[in-house]
Swiss-Prot record:
Any one GO molecular-function label of the UniProt entry: zinc ion binding
Catalytic activity: N(6)-carboxybiotinyl-L-lysyl-[protein] + acetyl-CoA = N(6)-biotinyl-L-lysyl-[protein] + malonyl-CoA
Complexes and interactors: Acetyl-CoA carboxylase is a heterohexamer composed of biotin carboxyl carrier protein (AccB), biotin carboxylase (AccC) and two subunits each of ACCase subunit alpha (AccA) and ACCase subunit beta (AccD).
The protein's required cofactors: Zn(2+)
BP terms from Gene Ontology: fatty acid biosynthetic process; malonyl-CoA biosynthetic process
Protein name per the record: Acetyl-coenzyme A carboxylase carboxyl transferase subunit beta
Designated gene of the protein: accD
Origin species: Klebsiella pneumoniae subsp. pneumoniae (strain ATCC 700721 / MGH 78578)
EC number(s) from the headed UniProt entry: 2.1.3.15
Annotated Gene Ontology cellular component terms: acetate CoA-transferase complex
Chief location: cytoplasm
PANTHER family: ACETYL-COENZYME A CARBOXYLASE CARBOXYL TRANSFERASE SUBUNIT BETA, CHLOROPLASTIC (PTHR42995:SF5)
Lineage: Bacteria, Pseudomonadati, Pseudomonadota, Gammaproteobacteria, Enterobacterales
Amino acid sequence: MSWIERIKSNITPTRKASIPEGVWTKCDSCGQVLYRAELERNLEVCPKCDHHMRMSARNRLHSLLDEGSLVELGSELEPKDVLKFRDSKKYKDRLASAQKETGEKDALVVMKGTLYAMPVVAAAFEFSFMGGSMGSVVGARFVRAVEQALEDNCPLICFSASGGARMQEALMSLMQMAKTSAALAKMQERGLPYISVLTDPTMGGVSASFAMLGDLNIAEPKALIGFAGPRVIEQTVREKLPPGFQRSEFLIEKGAIDMIVRRPEMRLKLASILAKLMNLPAPVAVSEAPHEGVVVPPAPDQEPEA
């Protein structure tokens, strides 16, 4: 018998496990491989290092408002390429691509509903839509949110995540800074609370307008907040910036924001603050029914347990 015939027939090559796309993701901060379903249940906060990942506008609003109370506002408003703007790509093509990728018509989603049974209007930025940039539709939807809050005599909450004004709309995008700020002046005249929640990142024209005009400005941990980015500032002043510059922890030390709140604690914290400001009874934290255990499949670099 030759040596070829003596090869053991029961030896089979190792098969790589087939892992569907989107089941696993990696933490941007600590690099830990995380099970997507478990991460979503944890509101996109890494359970290993507490890094707050970016969250979609709809998921944020659904996690904030009481189930079954949400009504979307301003969904009929759509962006138009009035200037026929073109850089390396036509603006209308950028819009079509962003709409297909995110399922949103523009970068701001507005809903009214209840928060611990208290009527509120809430808005949230979709950063995946052209970097959460502010154009005419974002400004119009924000004003619609203010008008609804005035009509319902209730508070307004806005979660910002934006790179600033949308350059493809030129002066029309810059006009939204004044437009939104003027609308908020009406909230102040009526004595209705406006709470601004700054998430990572909140920059440019958004940070220079309604994002910093809250009766309370609350930030998530380690959120980048400012007007120009750190690299631009370093190139301008020709100096090395201090560690953590423009992060929420740096800003609270300088008195630029009022508090930092972790995302899992945000809902109850907002409800408690608004109840005080509206002279309503404090919300009672209801313990949720325990979730069924999530069956976590082995990570791509792990072997199944015997």
